Amino acid sequence: MNSIKYYLIIIFVFSIQFNINNVSAQWTQAGDLNDIGLYPFISVVDSNIVWIAGGEISAVVYRTINGGLNWISIPTNGLPFELSGIAAKDASAAFVCDYAGTKTGGNAKVFKTTNAGMNWILIDSTGGTNGYFNGIKFSKTQPQFGVTFSDPPSGKGNPYFLLKTTDGGNNWSRSSAPGIPNTFGLFYTLFVIDPMMYGFQIINPTTTQTKSYITKDGGANWINGNQNITYAEGVDLVFSDNKQTGLITNYNTNHEIFRTTNGGVNWNSGSTGLNLSGFNGACWISGTNTVFIYSNASTSGNNIIRSDDGGFNWTAQSTSNTPGLMEMDYARFNNTIVTYCVSSKGNIIKSRQSVQNTGILQSGNNVPGDFKLYQNYPNPFNPNTKIRFSIASEKNNGKQNVKLIVYDLLGKELVKLADNKLSAGSYEVEFNGGNLPSGIYYYRLSAEDYVEVKSMILIK
């Protein structure tokens, strides 16, 4: 047995291969759907499995399992009205919410399927005579936690209706957010960081001003942001995983965005410097400083821009001249994202791009006396786990070159979790094995003359 272990270590040390993903910022066509309505919603499970929901008068649901080469119409028996949100878990399971079938709403519903639409099971309904659901989402970092929210069932100014799950959607519990006078919620604005922080945008239809509405303690208290954005339908709200930095997009043509650095208490006006008109949605990539803004303008052009510094600087991306973009979602596989976007005309575009992990968090202020690589936790894991390491005092009072790399059993490099100059301290980084099969993997820390290797087990 010892000789076998020694042989595996020899393979690992001397058979390291470098794997470079060829990613592109070019968006390409991934399908066309004719009957999904003006307000479609999209949920990306992985690079191949994507669900889309919408409809004009009745519910419409589609799914692809081959990256958009083919889209299959999912049965909607039991879904009475057009849909206002979708969150998919895999190729068979998904959750949807509805508009309640009238302009004023009332008794809106949430459903789930576990057999690709052969049956839809009612989870809950709002009751009341007003409002409808405005979206349903699960956390990217803690996918067992999800939220859906509805306008106040008793009318504007009354409490908002929420449902929450902490077990992946098996069970849902009712919650609420205090009513704000003469307001209701906005489509496409729901964001979910984790069980503590989530929120959405609200609008006053009389003044057409919108504000953020955010909780940081799991719904016990809600923050009503100080921004007043004139015009409104569709102003989007996104946050970084740090829970402090967030962006709000606007419905205008003057490049305006709003930014917070204190978790939504205060918002300041800024600009992208690039011309996007119409409703501008946003998508913040979890664990990074990368943010996308996309436009539903009816004119063709490059309707997506990208920032890699949390919204300070922006570059335009080629989008195959696809107008009317309504919602974007993605699946992240460490330093690569596969992103899909759906338009109001039923066009779907997708892109595979690289991102930089900003999840290297310094934990504690003490300077370690030794280099150390800790066992990942949890272990076994599925699909996320955290890896801690310590860097001893710097040489010559400078930072050290630190690399933390994950390999497979044959020594093939899978992803660089860290490749940075770091000061002495204790650090933590998160690894996502969502695109990998079950098995044993190695992670290797190197800093100056120090090298340490540990193994971890992914079980799906």
Q: Where in this protein do the model-derived segments appear?
A:
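Entry beta-strands of beta-propeller and related beta-repeat scaffolds
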Residues: 48-52, 92-96, 142-148, 195-199, ...
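Asp-box/BNR beta-propeller loop motif
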Residues: 26-31, 60-75, 109-124, 163-176, ...
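Coil residues (strongly favoring Ser/Thr
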Residues: 47, 91, 99, 125, ...
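Short glycine/acidic-enriched loop and turn motifs that connect beta-strands
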Residues: 56-58, 100-104, 152-156, 204-207, ...
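Repeated scaffold domains used in trafficking and secretory/extracellular systems
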Residues: 37-42, 81-87, 131-138, 183-191, ...
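An edge-strand/N-cap motif at the start of beta-rich repeat modules
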Residues: 23-44
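C-terminal outer-membrane/trafficking sorting elements
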Residues: 364-377, 381-460
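Blade-level signature of beta-propeller repeat domains, shared across WD40, Kelch, NHL, RCC1
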Residues: 326-357
